[in-house]
UniProtKB/Swiss-Prot annotation:
Cell compartment(s), UniProt: Cytoplasm
Basic and acidic residues compositional bias, start-end: 145-158
Organism: Prochlorococcus marinus (strain MIT 9301)
Protein name: SsrA-binding protein
Record-stated family: Belongs to the SmpB family.
Region (Disordered): 141-164
A GO cellular component entry from the record: cytosol
Amino acid sequence: MAKNSKKVKSNTNKANNFKLLAENRYAKFQYAISETIEAGIELLGTEVKSIRNGKANLRDGYCSFRDGEILLLNVHISPHKNVGSFFNHDPLRNRKLLLHKKEIIKMKSNTEKKGMTIVPLSLYLKGSWIKITLGVGKGKKLHDKRQDEKQKSIKKEINSALKR
């Protein structure tokens, strides 16, 4: 009986490990993120190969609601280099996100507020599944960005002074 419990333990550790494949640093600069959520993503085989090779760009991506589903738009996943052009995917195709109905309704109600949008923050491997982190945020104005940069530089100076 002890042998089986060890096997279960090792499998749960694998599921908790994740490998970052792509990150959208620009979104963290452009938006004040108020809420994040993890979602699955519906991909083709060649898209999975490209993402595992780090060929995904989340910078211009955003999410939209259609027919009770949430779609990821304008995310560029480069075609896989070792596959012929006939079998490759469209780099900018719309991709369906896999969320529970309650989560979709909650996200939709959050984005109906003025200025709120859903942006992809990161793509990562969780076990053998590719997951995406979405952020609900409001666009920052220029003066907000300047204040953030000032605060960041002040924190940097304080940390460097404390290290001395």
